């Protein structure tokens, strides 16, 4: 961000940002490309390498200066005479760069707010595993959970209106409207519950799509923080740090001023100091220690709140109230639940002995094996029944590359699923990947799997050791039982910031 600010000469104290002229500057395209934000966008057309990509940008800007209707006009033909490129290519270039430009004031306000509030930025909060450690610490004391799909705006114009709080440049907002209406399937962008939400527009314009989604989530979650602070005697102090990635510092004060009078008389019905919120992959969880009646009140209160004040559409029938003691949460590759673990205690008083049954709540996380096998089958490591098959397209690689690829895939999966309470699923994955690796190598050398395993079995075994197993074996070389017991423990890593494609069953 400092690199952006030095190029653009923007001062954090400025109240208005005129971003539209930056679209006509060559260096903003080069900076975005070099910064790694979208390295492939200018190079996707065949026949153009790194040296000629800047030429495309220069001629694009020249055309924008010279023509009134530009190359992005709806009346343009799909194929432009200029360099033989079609309109969609230039639309893609400009939409990606425009999204980068519009992120500048948001990022600057975020950094300024962090410094003003003295919030220490922690990368550990970005870890996916931090969600599960949070659930492990808090869900044992809760009773009910609301499964809430994130509501979507009734019209795309609402997304643009939400950005007016951050972006004061009207021209940039008009350009954003143009990109949204230019999309042929733009209605699917706002329906987050649809499998087709990643339409042709979102596939070609990932950064703009995520920018709009982030601003939408910002608007949606700011209401949660306000209601949480208003309904509890203990004000939330850590919410700002936990939500630092979605850019709504300063929004809380604005909401407090606007909505305080409207809700002050009603929120006494919802006093609940034990409300916890988690968001993941277009869905969210709201857990509470309250009763079923209280959760039902929250459910309809949120539906009317989103509809009346944010113009967000949510279907009450898709919001489910579940009791944690008999409900499992399936998300991010884990199946999480709170189970009652029976415990028997023997108590003796004088000559009489008593057996007392106690039920202890335990947070349990397992890896569902069938969705994981489905992901492996989709990637051609096994069939739908879980029987390993060779990876034919890797047969032309060297032996070391093949073994390294299979070993790395297993280590990544094992690292991500290290928080599982039961490791049986991971042993099944190791078996599938090891045998798939052996079949691939046997096919390459025109040999049988049995003969190949007999020759290279020990080498394959070493490649499929995880980091934890290596550490345990080095620490306890002679005590194998301790090593096995430690390797079965649940471990959460705070360096995992993205979900593995094979682990993502959504």
Curated annotation (Swiss-Prot):
**Does this entry carry the keyword Protein biosynthesis?**
no
Localization per Swiss-Prot or TrEMBL: Plastid, Chloroplast
GO CC aspect terms: chloroplast
Looking at the UniProt entry, the stretches that span the membrane are none
Cite a single GO MF annotation: RNA binding
Q: Which domain of life is it from?
A: Eukaryota
Q: Name one Pfam family in it.
A: MatK_N
Protein's GO biological process = mRNA processing; RNA splicing; tRNA processing
Q: Which UniProt keywords apply?
A: Chloroplast, mRNA processing, Plastid, RNA-binding, tRNA processing
Give a short account of what the protein does: Usually encoded in the trnK tRNA gene intron. Probably assists in splicing its own and other chloroplast group II introns.
| Family, similarity comment | Belongs to the intron maturase 2 family. MatK subfamily.
Fetch the PANTHER family from UniProt. Answer: MATURASE K
**Full protein name:** Maturase K
